[in-house]
């Protein structure tokens, strides 16, 4: 991996931005990589748009903005509508299959994770679905090590 650009998007209250902060922390503090994290959200406390953009690299990051992500993590259907067209043609889409039901055509690699169901059944808290999605990202891409991700979550 030289550099991975990703977008994590959902609605307010799902923890999309927190997931980006934790991912960046795992990369920098525990795996010795470079990372940049930016975010945007609407004014609603819950239910509005929320997204984070993360760049992780083995080398210094010269331009700190994601324009064409390698990976889009969609935690809500609205995330697909907003960001699917920004995904690189060879990019990957990771969805919370409990929340996203319509997938756009033309995406070559799609990973479905039933994160909300798993969070509710195993952890008794659907708000932890963001951490389950991060675990899936880590397993699929190895962008950060499992140990680094676990330490960043615990920190």
Predicted regions: what is each one?
Residues 1-155:
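Active-site cofactor/cluster-binding pocket
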């Amino acid at each position: 991996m030289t550099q991975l650009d990703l977008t994590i998007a959902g609605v307010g209250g799902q923890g999309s931005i927190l997931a980006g902060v934790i991912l960046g922390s795992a990369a920098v503090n525990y795996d010795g990589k470079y990372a940049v994290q930016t975010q945007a959200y609407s004014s609603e406390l819950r239910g509005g748009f929320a997204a984070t953009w993360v760049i992780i690299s083995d080398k210094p990051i010269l331009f700190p903005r994601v324009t064409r992500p390698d990976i889009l993590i969609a935690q809500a259907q609205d995330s697909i509508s907003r960001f699917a067209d920004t995904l690189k043609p060879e990019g990957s889409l990771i969805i919370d299959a409990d929340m996203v039901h319509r997938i756009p055509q033309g995406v070559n690699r799609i990973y479905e994770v039933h994160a909300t169901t798993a969070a509710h059944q195993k952890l008794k808290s659907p708000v932890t679905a963001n951490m389950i999605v991060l675990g899936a990202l880590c397993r699929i891409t190895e962008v950060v090590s499992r140990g680094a991700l676990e330490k960043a979550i615990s920190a």
